[in-house]
Design a protein with these regions (language model features):
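Transmembrane alpha-helical segments of polytopic membrane transport and secretion proteins
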Residues: 1-32, 270-284
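Hydrophobic alpha-helical transmembrane segments of membrane transport/permease proteins
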Residues: 25, 29, 33-72, 226-234
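Generic hydrophobic transmembrane alpha-helix motif, especially the helices
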Residues: 66, 70, 100-101, 110-172, ...
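Transmembrane alpha-helix signature in integral membrane proteins
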Residues: 76-111, 265
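Transmembrane alpha-helices
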Residues: 85-101, 130, 136, 190-222, ...
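Non-cytoplasmic
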Residues: 134-137, 146-151, 155, 164, ...
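C-terminal transmembrane helix and the adjacent membrane-cytosol boundary/short C-terminal tail
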Residues: 140, 147, 157, 203-213, ...
Length: 284
């Protein structure tokens, strides 16, 4: 459809038929599809994701195996479906812990100021002095490979972005009239902070958290690819890409389909972040 034809079509299409935030709608639909895939995997996946069948190894896509099989004869389609459960968990839990820690420390830093603000900001400076992924790898190497180590490392490194965002919002809002009025009424600092101030300072952080899901997803896949995250034979997209690396020229499907799954889920979170930014008037 040409631009002129599209403009005419858009002009005569009733406004109620057109979504106001197409990015928000598209991102929500993509994520809902992945949630359904993750929930239905135990019943819909045609094969056991870790069951090996050497006689069916490296079969191309088609027929019984729509995504082909890997070098152990495991069905790629089933493994992609089961891996969505782990990767969704990584994306969401890997954001929840840094969000809570960073929001609390950023709010206290911006509201109390003084020594508290100085200490929090110096810790943030130290964390930001190291590359994100390098610091993550160092922490996981000390704790040992596994999902728990990944979540701990993510909480120790990822909170700084939320702390900076919330601190900046609190510094702007704490001089507003409604905050000064709450103080003049004798409300405690905790009530002013958590009832009147913090709810109005979370918009940017909520939008950023959706963008951060993309970073956490890619970080989890990268760390699993390096052998420090989810351990084989569990199905995880980063692990599947790593396993298929040696067969990239002879069995392209081993890396292509889990790679596409990572891209689609990341696209869903990114579109949702853009849509929320437009809806709430904040950009990540």
């Amino acid at each position: 459809m040409s631009r002129a034809a599209f403009a005419v079509f858009a002009r005569f299409t009733p406004a109620r038929w057109r979504p106001r935030q197409p990015a928000l709608l598209a991102g929500t639909l993509i994520l809902l599809c992945w949630v359904l895939v993750a929930l239905l995997a135990p019943w819909v996946a045609p094969f056991d994701p870790i069951a090996q069948d050497p006689s069916a190894s490296l079969q191309p896509p088609g027929g019984v195996h729509p995504f082909g099989t890997d070098n152990y004869g495991r069905d790629i389609f089933s493994r992609v479906m089961w891996a969505s459960r782990i990767d969704l968990q990584i994306s969401l839990l890997g954001v929840v812990f840094p969000f809570c820690i960073g929001t609390l420390l950023g709010a206290l830093s911006g509201y109390l100021g003084g020594l508290t603000d100085t200490l929090v900001m110096r810790v943030i400076d130290v964390v930001l002095a190291f590359p994100f992924l390098v610091l993550m790898l160092a922490i996981i190497a000390v704790l040992g490979p596994g999902l728990l180590s990944f979540y701990i490392a993510m909480a120790m490194v990822g909170w700084v972005s939320y702390a900076r965002l919330v601190r900046a919002q609190v510094l702007t809002l704490r001089q507003r009239d409604y905050i000064l009025a709450a103080r003049s009424l004798g409300y405690s600092h905790w009530r002013v902070l958590f009832i009147h101030l913090l709810p109005n300072a979370l918009t940017s952080s909520l939008v950023f958290s959706m963008s951060d899901c993309v970073l956490v997803l890619l970080s989890g896949a990268a760390i699993s690819y390096l052998g420090l995250g989810v351990q084989p034979p569990l199905a995880e997209w980063g692990v599947m890409v790593a396993e298929g690396q040696s067969f990239i020229t002879t069995a392209w499907w081993m890396t292509t389909f889990p790679g596409l799954a990572i891209v689609l889920l990341a696209m869903g979170f990114s579109l949702l972040a853009d849509g929320l930014g437009e809806r709430l008037g904040a950009r990540p």
